[in-house]
């Protein structure tokens, strides 16, 4: 640290006077005699002990000059003038996400159309307005139709031939209805819904037995319940006998 200070402020700076000259006495005059009870300041200051025990301050080191200096900051490459995209090599990602996607040309969808259809028609004079205002000069490109070609435009008497009758007739649309499962006696039942008659007879035979069992269970529950009249009527009789 002293080397850095010497380089910054110079080595030829005048050092402060030490000893009696620092106290304001002339070099020729002897220092005043101190009373015996007053000891020097360096001797009176007790040494401070650290964690390990050695002295942190020495009496002889109090008169040495010291300076509170900080190390110079390290130069930083990243400043406001640097481009962070090029610094971190993110040019490809920037072009991928931030670049505008070029739309496909119209000629890619309509390759059979002649001319330059990608550019507007005002440039090459192929717009509809330019064709109306300045029609192109054509020669005898239109030739009259022959008699064989005109037969296609003539009206014929009589009904239409059978092969052309159904061309203009549209088939009726099928009405979509909700399918309801109704059983019609005339329709045959599918195999899944067909049941054996023996099973139906067994179910009918078991129905009265099941009803009897349910009635017996209800009677047993009513007997054991406290609301049953037979149970409440038997309790006072038992108490009277006791």
From Swiss-Prot:
Location of the protein in the cell: Nucleus
Superkingdom classification of source: Eukaryota
Gene Ontology biological-process annotations: positive regulation of transcription by RNA polymerase II
Biased composition (Basic residues): 171-184, 211-223
Keywords assigned: Activator, Nucleus, Transcription, Transcription regulation
GO cellular component: mediator complex
Main location: nucleus
Chain residue ranges for the region called Disordered: 1-33, 171-242
Signal peptide: none
A matching Pfam family: Med19
InterPro entries in alphabetical order: Mediator_Med19_met (IPR019403)
Bias-annotated ranges (Polar residues): 1-15, 232-242
Keyword Cell cycle: no
Subunit relationships: Component of the Mediator complex.
Protein family (similarity comment): Belongs to the Mediator complex subunit 19 family.
PANTHER family to which the protein is assigned, alphabetical: LUNG CANCER METASTASIS-RELATED LCMR1 PROTEIN, MEDIATOR OF RNA POLYMERASE II TRANSCRIPTION SUBUNIT 19
Protein's name according to its UniProt entry: Mediator of RNA polymerase II transcription subunit 19-A
Organism: Danio rerio (Zebrafish)
Taxonomic lineage from the root: Eukaryota, Metazoa, Chordata, Craniata, Vertebrata
Protein's gene: med19a
């Amino acid at each position: 640290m002293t080397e850095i200070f010497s380089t910054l402020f110079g080595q030829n700076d005048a050092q402060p006077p030490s000893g009696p000259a620092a106290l304001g006495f002339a070099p020729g005059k002897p220092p005043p005699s101190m009373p015996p009870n007053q000891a020097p300041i360096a001797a009176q200051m007790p040494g401070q002990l650290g964690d390990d025990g050695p002295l942190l301050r020495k009496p002889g080191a109090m008169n040495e000059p010291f300076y509170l200096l900080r190390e110079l900051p390290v130069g930083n490459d990243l400043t406001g003038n640097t481009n962070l995209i090029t610094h971190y090599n993110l040019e490809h990602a920037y072009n991928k996400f931030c670049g505008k996607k070029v739309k496909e040309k119209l000629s890619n969808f309509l390759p059979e159309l002649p001319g330059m259809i990608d550019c507007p028609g005002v440039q090459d004079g192929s717009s509809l307005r330019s064709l109306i205002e300045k029609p192109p000069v054509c020669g005898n490109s239109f030739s009259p139709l022959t008699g064989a070609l005109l037969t296609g435009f003539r009206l014929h008497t009589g009904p239409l031939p059978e092969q052309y009758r159904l061309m203009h007739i549209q088939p009726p649309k099928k009405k979509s209805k909700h399918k309801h499962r109704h059983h019609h006696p005339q329709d045959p039942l599918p195999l899944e819904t067909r049941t054996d008659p023996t099973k139906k007879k067994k179910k009918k035979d078991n129905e009265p037995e099941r009803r009897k069992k349910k009635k017996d269970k209800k009677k047993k529950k009513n007997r054991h319940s406290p609301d049953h009249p037979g149970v409440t009527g038997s309790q006072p009789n038992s108490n009277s006998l006791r």
